[in-house]
């Protein structure tokens, strides 16, 4: 039984889930909004919020931490160019999830996650 186990498993192994989160975060940073399933959007939201909170203080340590999560120098640079200026005075709530309805092929609930 999974009593008292926090976090979404999304039917994937730890490594697969970590890669999924990394790819979703990179896509969100590069495109500002992405369309994905509601479960994936809800699972990646705390990860990207924490990453933006780290990026608000532009220090070498913060850059190393962000690079370890993202593994993409281009996405890390882009994050550190807009995060301190855009979210400098904002304490959390950097993303918004909007429900889009079911997907045509399999009926999965779709959502739009975007940076505010």
Curated annotation (Swiss-Prot):
GO biological process: translation
Sample GO molecular function, one term: structural constituent of ribosome
Keyword flag Cell cycle: no
Family the UniProt entry places it in: Belongs to the bacterial ribosomal protein bL17 family.
Gene3D superfamilies hit by this protein: Ribosomal protein L17
Statement: the UniProt record of this protein carries the keyword Ribosomal protein: yes
Swiss-Prot/TrEMBL keywords: Ribonucleoprotein, Ribosomal protein
Gene: rplQ
Name by which UniProt lists this protein: Large ribosomal subunit protein bL17
A Pfam family hit: Ribosomal_L17
Organism: Chloroflexus aggregans (strain MD-66 / DSM 9485)
One Gene Ontology term, aspect cellular component: cytosolic large ribosomal subunit
InterPro entries the record matches: Ribosomal_bL17, Ribosomal_bL17_sf
Assembly and oligomerization: Part of the 50S ribosomal subunit. Contacts protein L32.
TM spans (from-to): none
């Amino acid at each position: 039984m999974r009593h008292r186990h926090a976090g979404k498993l999304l039917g994937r192994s730890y490594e697969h889930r970590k890669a999924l989160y990394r790819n979703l975060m990179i896509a969100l940073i590069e495109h500002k909004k992405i369309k994905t399933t509601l479960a994936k959007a809800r699972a990646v939201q705390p990860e990207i919020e924490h990453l933006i909170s780290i990026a608000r203080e532009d220090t070498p340590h913060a850059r190393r931490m962000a690079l370890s999560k993202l593994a993409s120098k281009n996405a890390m640079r882009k994050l550190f160019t807009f995060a301190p200026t855009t979210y400098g005075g904002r304490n959390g709530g950097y993303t918004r999830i909007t429900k889009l309805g079911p997907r045509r092929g399999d009926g999965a609930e779709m959502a739009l996650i975007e940076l505010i």
